Structure formats: structure tokens, C-alpha cells
């Protein structure tokens, strides 16, 4: 027997009062005894926390919170912990004898919410000698220990061999591990299950009858029949999916036309544009090649004609060049003549102005002398005026101040003495004693005149001396100039060499003046030589081309006649070529007509041929002619009929299998569904239901033993059955009834003997039945399920075969329809000759004709070239004829060389002038000094010294006279000497002098004014003369500058030469223009012939360049289009050969029509609408392909893969026709097969209710002997709700009345159930629940039952268990009994979910057990012992149970630290466990050995 798992211990680490405490959990009852605050509730809280570590559920209330719904903020856990890491660990040994330590790490989280961080973990495989505290607490010293953190715990466990540490990220995983190892009785999948488990623990902890549990006993006691509900949900889901698929098929059938329309129009739209671009590209490439050939031939012809024309133009260009030079020379000569004439007129102006300038110069010199004399007179007048002013002022000051007057008179006396001394000095120097102050002025004037004369003489000598000195310098300068030109020259030869150099320079100037004339003559000779060379080249070229030497005019005339005759002959041959080419053109037009006819019939033939190839692929036949097509069409029709018959047979077999499967799947597997109803009517059970759990091996035996009675009804009593049978309306032909206990039925009533493969049953003394074991037994659920599996496999095979047959039938129908369509549309042309092959032959012939035409055109071109050559020869002869005289002209070269020598001399002369021109110009100015004698310079210098000495002596005399003249007015102060002695008369004399001085002052002022006025007039006249002289001088200089800018030497000979030169050039220009007109008339005919060819070639070249650019630019786009089409596998859809024969306008019209249809078709699809709008850009053809790909992708996405399994929309459209009908039929049948009857639903629900009633009856048996106080028994009462019983009756007995609900496609089965419930219970308000929700509730059997708890209390009998009707102890005991029932129910419910070798732990809690008396506690102990349950209770100190383990808890405080002192006691009334038979045998054996 498998032992139940047990809790071994509870370990608390770092809780309030418990630093590291382990409580051993007794196998029966563990009691925590102590006073208030001792720590009993804390210990239970640690146990519950380790069991359910969900802080959202944990809530440890105390008695002060009895009426509170929220309690304290920390929910009783935060305050029970110490700071730091805390642990609560449960040590468990399960049924497999595995030691498990389920623990949680708790830690307070700082904050006002007082939350606790909980982390669950598991330690598995700890050795038995290792305590939980050894892992969770680290011993630091003998008296100190430290709580380990969870990582340290993990490391410590890792060091223990065989131990494993596992943490859990969620509580669900933690509880799943607990369930697997048998620690908790129920699998807690979610928070709802955890809440139920916690409510159960909480109800156990606080005792009494929990209203939370009694109100929802169905959820706690009745297991959820998930399989039934899931079956219903799966059935509804399958029906819903089936109906959705049917709707999808209808939608797909509607989409089929859209598919066809969209794919047809998009194919037409894109393929037409695709083929239009392909045709256009092919045509453009062909046109490009044709134009390139024509361009190359035209270029060759043009090159030939151009070479001919170039030779003609060379002569014209030469003549034009000569004419241009002549025009330039003529224009230059005219300009030179005009320039010479202008220079002569300018020279005349200069001479006239120079005469005026000389006259002005003479008048200017005279006026300057007059102004000089007037200036001297003004200065003398100013001096006299100043002296008179000073005299007046002096006399006035003397009169004003007598002392001053005396001083003045003394000064004047001194001045008078100095004047007398000056007079004596002048007499001595002049050696004239008679000299007086009055006669000094005349003598001074005389001496001044003499001074001027001597000064002039001295200046003349000075000038001669300077000239002599300058002559010596100029001689040296001129001699240096001669040496600069000629190099080292003797001094005596300097004058001669200078004259020679000047002469050479003049000759060079004369040579340079002939420069223009010689250059013009050179150009004339060059042109004549060039003409001679051109004529000789023409003659040489003509000799090379025609092998004829042109040496005279007669030969030229003969050649002209020969070429004229050749021209006539070539023109005749050219006409013949044109006629033959016209005939070939006619034949080419006939072939073009045939090609057009073939092109017109080719599209229809291509469509017919494609349809024929499709038929051949579909049918796999040759189909060589129309007769074979008709014959094969008949064969397809016969095959289709045969396939339809095979399909019908398979459908019939499938129906039989479905009915048999449905019969075997029904309860009991009865052949007759009425038996179940009869069993309910008679109050019995089908025999097959009783034996429903037998094994497959036993099924043949029991099936043979019961024989025909295997579908009998077992009733508890046969009395009164006959009356009920008589009242039956509908009953099978044979109905077997067997009397027996339904709950404990056996086969003892049958006398059966098993034989070899059979059973022999002795019915009575005279009857015996022999039944062989059936080959396929159907008795028992296992046998039926085995048979069902085989039948379902067979049915799947039949369904697959039927689907294949349906597909083949549809395929044959489609093939027959394709034959019909082919016969109607394409049979007439499908077997005609291939027009494309005939078209290729015709095109080859046409190409041959075109090549022949090209050969004739080439021949004609050759004739034209010969004609052109002859014409060019005639033109060359015409050009040579007038210039034949130049061929033998030999003097041109000699004249040209002579002129080149003159030009060489000219270059040398220009180089000489450029090198020495300036030097020679300077030399020419000073050449005369070379003849002068520089040795006379010394005598002249001595004469100059003597004259200078005499002049200096004269200047000393003049100075003495000047000093005398300056002091002559001082002689008037002779009286001052006397006045110094006669001071009394001084004043009167001063006054007289003042009057005399004032009159003198007035007279001198008038003289000064007259002199100044006269000087002003003279100055004005001088300024006017100077301005006139300056203007004339500037004008002359400007005229000279202009004359110099003319750059010509103006003389009478120059103008005569210029006129003669101009007249000569004018005559030559007239002659050249006449010859140019002749040349232009000669080449006009050649230009006209080339003009047409050039025009044609330019047009062809432009067309070729445009076409080639178009082809090259389109190539990249076309390559991208092809790449897109091939990568997306749409090229075969777009490249339609029949469209290649349509014109571009027809294809464009086709594309535009489809575009209009597509705009309507994609109006509601944004992606396709945008793609279509972008594809309308004709410059981007790849966008149309992208649109086509988008349509394909869109249709692929629209293809339902559950109906059609292909990615190609075109193939999908073809498969739709085949698949839709078959799928519709199959889905309709599947819906009928999936639909469950209301009777079956009622039967399943009733059977489930009956099973649960029996299970609760078994649970009640375990609680029947429980007693708490006056309570002598506890039981659960279960009954079916009246409203739901009416619903079950309506489902099973009134099916016909409710067909509108269950056979309607508008409602699901759940909705039909809800509608039926409302129909049979109109008085019940359904609230806001939807029919679907209500229907799902009605499919759960638990909603049909009502559960209540009843107690047998004293004389009152069985009463409803309510807290108000029971004492506290009775309520606690009753509540514990109910909780035990719930735990036992959970274990039974979860048995199939856990391993068979696991029996889960059972443990309940009870706080404040003092409310129970000793008898009640003993009852609890008995209940725990009987049900193998552990109980953890808390009781005050006055409770001392006799059994189990008791812990005495006392909380002690030492200084600021408190801890709980714990003492454990074993119960004093412990009874030994009963020994097993093996133990007794072992003890007896040990005793015998001892003896």
C-alpha cells in the first residue's frame, strides 16, 4: 500500500521571537500551547505563508479585526518579520520517500505600504542528517549566527552532494511543483484555484462553518467536467467553423466572378501593353537595322561625291583666298592714299600755325621788355614814396618829442658825415674829384650802361668758352656713337665714318619704304604659283584616274568628247536597272499581301492550338484530328459516368460507417437508442453501462456470456415491471430485464461455463445457450472504443477515397466541358496548317527579294557613281581648259626668288634700323662737331678771365656810386650839424621841413599810382599774348603728333605712288571676280546633285539616331520588365503570341478598355488602386507588370487555402469549379454528422449528475459517525434544481416541439439551450446575460445541482447547518468535517492528474482550540487518525491533549531583545502503531534465533 506523504517540520528563520526555530510536525496532531502573544499565530502564519506565498491572498486577522473587511495595512505579515532576510520552510517526505524542502524567502520592503517581498524556492535531495537551519543559517561562532541570503543558500546547497536548489519565477510554478510531489491536494492552475485553497485554509484556521465555502460548495466539491464542456465547445467550434467555411465557399463562389473579371481584365490590360512594347521594340530594332544599312551606303556615296566636290572646291577656295587678299590689298591701297592726302593737309596746317606762332613770339618778347621797364619805374616810385612817408613821420615825431628830435638830428648829423665819406670814397675810386652827389646819378647811369656792355661781352666770351667746352664734349659723344655702330674707329676717321653710317641708314629707310609694294608683288606671284600647282595637280589627278596625259588644249578637247559619249551609255544601263527593280518590287508587294493574310488568321489559330495543347495535357491523348477529338470526348463522358457511380457507392459506405460509429459512440453502445429511455422509465440501468469499464480481454467473454441479453436493463426489483411494460408505446421487439443491485451487480445469477473460444450458459434444467466469442466484441467501453478506432480509420479512408473520387469526377466533368468548348469554338481552325510556319516561309522569300532589290540598288548606285565620275571629269576638263597656259610658264619661279631676295634685303634693312636707328638719329644731329678743333679752348679761356676782371672793377665803382646815391638825401641833413648847436631854432625849422616833406609825399604817391596802373595794363597784355602763344604751340604739337601717327612720309611723290598702286589693284580685283563667277557656275551642278543625297542622309541619320536612342533607352526598361515577369512567373501569362499580330492602336485600345474596367474593379482596394494609378504612366512599362504582380499577390491572398491549395490565381479559378461543389457537399454532410441531438445532451448531463450524486453519497458515509456536542452526524444534501429538471425533460422528451431551436442554423447549440431554458422557464429573469453565456452555463452540470450541509442535532433531527443554530464548538467541528470532505473530494478529482505512486499530504489548521471540549477534541483526533490527516492546532495553556506533539511557547524579553522559548512534549497517551504481518514474522524469527 502506498503511504501518504507527511509534513515533517516547519522552520522559521528571523521571525519575531524566532531567530532559527524548527517545529517537528506530528503525523497526527501538533499542538501549539501558550498564552496570549506567545507566538502561536505567528507560527501558523509562517506555515501558511510557505504553503501559499501569495501576498494578495495572505491576511492574518486577529480578534480585534473580526468585524473588519480590510484589517491592518500590512495584512498581519509585515509586523511578524524582523529586518533583513527571513525564511519559512516546510520539510516534507512524500509517498516516494523523497525529502523536499519547500521554502520562501521574505523581506520587508521599505515604504508606507508595508509590503513584503516573497521569493519561493525548493531544495531537493537534502541528506537526512542535514537540518533546514544548517542551510538557511550560517554559524559565525559558538554564540553567533547569521541569516544567509538566498544566493548564499543556493551556494551552500550546491556544496552538498545530491542536493538541488530551484527557484521559481511565479507562484503557479511553485504550486505545480508542490502538486507533482504530492504536497497539496489540488493542482492550482491560476489565482482562482489559489484563492479557493486559501479560503479553505483560512476557514480551517479560524474554525466554524465558513459561509464563503458553504455558499460555493459546488465549486469546491463538484469537479469541473471539463471534458464534456470541451466536447461541447469543440462540437460548437467545429460547427461554427463548418458554417463559416460554407459561408466562405459562398463568398468564394461570389469572388470567383470577381477573380475571373479581375484576372481577365488585368491580363488584357498588362499583356496588351506588354506585347505592344514587345512589338514596338521588335519593329524599332528592325527599322534601326534598315536605317543603319541605308545610312552606311549613303555615307559611302556621300564620301565619294564629297571627294569629287572637294577637288572642285579647292580651286574655288584658292580663287576666293586670292580675291580676299586682293580685296585686302585694294582696301589697304585706298586707305594708304587717303592717309597720304590727310598727311599733306595736316602738313599745311602745321606750317600755317608755325608762322602765326613766330609772329606771336616776337610780340611777346617786346611786351616783356616793356613790362620790365614799367616794373623798374614802379619800384623807384615805391622807394621815393616810402622815403617821403618816413620823412613826414620822422618830422612829426620830432615835433611831438623834442628829445627825440634831438636824437634824430644827431642821427642825421651822423648820416650826413657818412654821406660825405661815401662821396670821398666814390671820388677816390673813380678818380674824379669833381664828383658831387647831384652828378653821381648821371655817372651811375653811365657806368651801368657800361656794365651792361661789358656783361654782354663777358657773356659772349662765356658762351664761346662754353661752346668750345661743349664742342669738346659733343665731339666725344659723337665719337662714342660712331663706335657704338661700327665698333673701334680711328679718331681721325670719325667724321668720314659718321657720314657713311648716316648714308647707309638713309638707304635702309628707302628700302623699308618699298615694303608694301614688294609684299603685294610677292602675294601675286604666290597666287600665280598656287594656280600653276593646282593646274598641274588636276592634270596629274586626271592622269591617275583616267590614264590620260593632258599636255595641250587638243588633248583636253578629245577627253571631253569621250566622257560625253560615256555619259549617254551609263544612263541607258541605269534605266534598265530601274525596270528590273520595279518588277522585284511588285513581287515583294504580293508576298506582303500573303504575310498580312497569314497574320490575320494566326491569332485565331494560336488560340485554337493553345486550347488543343491544353486538352492534350488534360486528357493525355494525341488528338491528331477532329475525329479523334470527338472520340475522346465520348470516352471522357463514359469515364465521368463510371466515376460518378463509384463516388455514390463510397458515399453510401461512408453513411453506413457514420451510423455505426454514432451507435457505438452512444452510451452503452446499444443498437436501439430507445433502450436508454426505457431504462429511465423503468428505474433501471443498462447492463452495458454497468460493464462499461471491463477490459478488452474480458469483453469477448462477457459478450458471449450474456448473448442477446447484453443490452438488457438491470432493475432492482422485477415486481411491478410487467404493469409498466404493458403501458409502453414504443419498445424493441426483444427486451431483456435482469433483477439485481445496480450499485453492486455481479453475474452470479448466470450459470456459465467457459469453453474453448465460447461460453455455455445453463439457463434452466431444459435450456442451454452456447455462444462463441465474437470476432469483434462490442461489450464494454474499451471494446467499443477499439472498434470505433477501426471504424473511424476505415471511415477516414472512405472519406479520402470519396474526396478523391469527387475530385476525379469534377475533373472529368471539367474535361468534358473543355472538350465541348473546344469543339464549339476552335475545332474548325485547330487542325489547319500552321500559319506561323507559312508566315516564316513568306518572310524568308520576301527577305530574298529585298536582298535582290538591294543588289539592284547597289548596281544603280555604282552606275550613278560612274556617271558622277564622268561628270566630275568633264568639270575638271572645263576647269583646266582656261588655265592650260600656266602649265608651261617657267619664269614665275625666278621672279619669285628675285622678289624673295629683295624681301631679304628689306628684312636686313629693317633689322639695321631696329638695331641702330636711334643711335644714327642722335649721330646725325651732332655729326658736324666732329669737324671742329677743340685746341682753341685755352686762348679763349684767358680772354674770358681778363674781361671778367675788368667787369668786377666796374662793379666796385658802381657799388660806390650806389652807396653814394643811397645816402644822397643824407646831404640834406647838413643843417642838422648846425641845429645841434642852434637848438632854439630847431622847432621852427622842423615845422618848415614838415610842410616841405608832406608836399613831397603827396607828389610821390601820385607818381606811384600812375606807375602801378601802367604796369597793370602792360601785364594784362603780356598774359593775353602768353595764352595765345601757348594755345598755338599746343595746337602745333597736336598736329605734329597726328602727323606722326599717320606713319607716312607726306610728299608729292607719295601721293602719286599711292594712286598708281590703288588703280593697279582695282584692275586685278575685277579680273579675279570674273574668274570666280566662272568657277561658281562650274560647281553649281555638282552641288545640286549632292544636295538631295545629303538631305536624305541627314534625315536617315536623324531617324537612325532617334530610333537607336529609343532602342537603347528602352532596353534597360525592357530588361527590367522581363526580369520582373520572369522572377514572378508571369511571363507566360503576359507573352501572348496572338497579340503579336495586332497593331499598336488595337493593343492600346484593348489596354484602355481594360483600364476602364479595372478602375471600377479596384475602386474599393486602396493598394491596387494606387498601383493601377502608377501603372498608367506609359513611360514606365515596368509599373504595369508591378500592377499585374500586385493583382496576382492580392488574389493569392484572397485564395482560401482551406478550399484551394495553389498559389496561382488562374489555376485557382480553374480549381474553384472542381473544389467548390465537392466541398459544399462534404461540409453539409459534416455539419449533419457534427450536430448533436438534444436527447444526447440530456442523457450526458443526467449521467454526470447521477455519478456525482453517488460520489457525494460515498463522502457522506465517512462523516455519518462524527459527533461534536449535540451533533451526531454531518451530511451533504444534493438535489437537482426544478427549473433545470424542466430543461432536461424538454431536451429529452419534447424534441419535436423545439426543432426550431436545435435544427436552425441561426443558433449555436449553446444559444439554442439558452432559448429553450427561457421558453420552459418564462418566469425566471435572465438579467443581462447573453444567450451564448447562459447556454455555456447550462452545459455545465454543476449549475443543475444545489448542495447544502445538514447536521443531525439531538431531537431536532437533520437540520440545515448554520452557525446560529449550533454552539461554537459544534460549528468548529462541523466546519472541519466539511473541509475534510472538500480535501478528500479534491484528491479524488486530481487523482488522474498526478502520478499513481503519489498520495498527497493532508493537513488542516485550527486556531483557538479552547472553544472545543475534550470530547470534541478527541473526535477531531479520531477523525484525523481515521482519514490519515495531520492537524496543527493552537490552544491556550490549559489545553493538554493526550495525543500527538505539544509545544509550549513562552515569549520572554531580555533587555531590548525578545524571543520565544519553546518546549516540545510527546502525548502521554500515545498508542503504538499496529505491527504489520511482516514485522510480527521478523520478531518471531528473531526470538527463535535468540533462544
UniProtKB/Swiss-Prot annotation:
Stretches assigned to coiled coil: 302-450, 490-600, 781-806, 836-1109, 1210-1239
Residue ranges, annotated region (Disordered): 1059-1080
Key words, A-Z: ATP-binding, Cell cycle, Cell division, Chromosome partition, Coiled coil, Cytoplasm, DNA condensation, DNA-binding, Nucleotide-binding
GO molecular function: ATP binding; DNA binding
Cross-referenced InterPro entries: MukB, MukB/SMC, MukB_hinge, MukB_hinge_sf, MukB_N_dom, P-loop_NTPase
GO-annotated biological processes: cell division; chromosome condensation; chromosome segregation; DNA replication
Subunit structure: Homodimerization via its hinge domain. Binds to DNA via its C-terminal region. Interacts, and probably forms a ternary complex, with MukE and MukF via its C-terminal region. The complex formation is stimulated by calcium or magnesium. Interacts with tubulin-related protein FtsZ.
HAMAP family, sorted: MukB
Protein name: Chromosome partition protein MukB
Taxonomic lineage: Bacteria, Pseudomonadati, Pseudomonadota, Gammaproteobacteria, Vibrionales
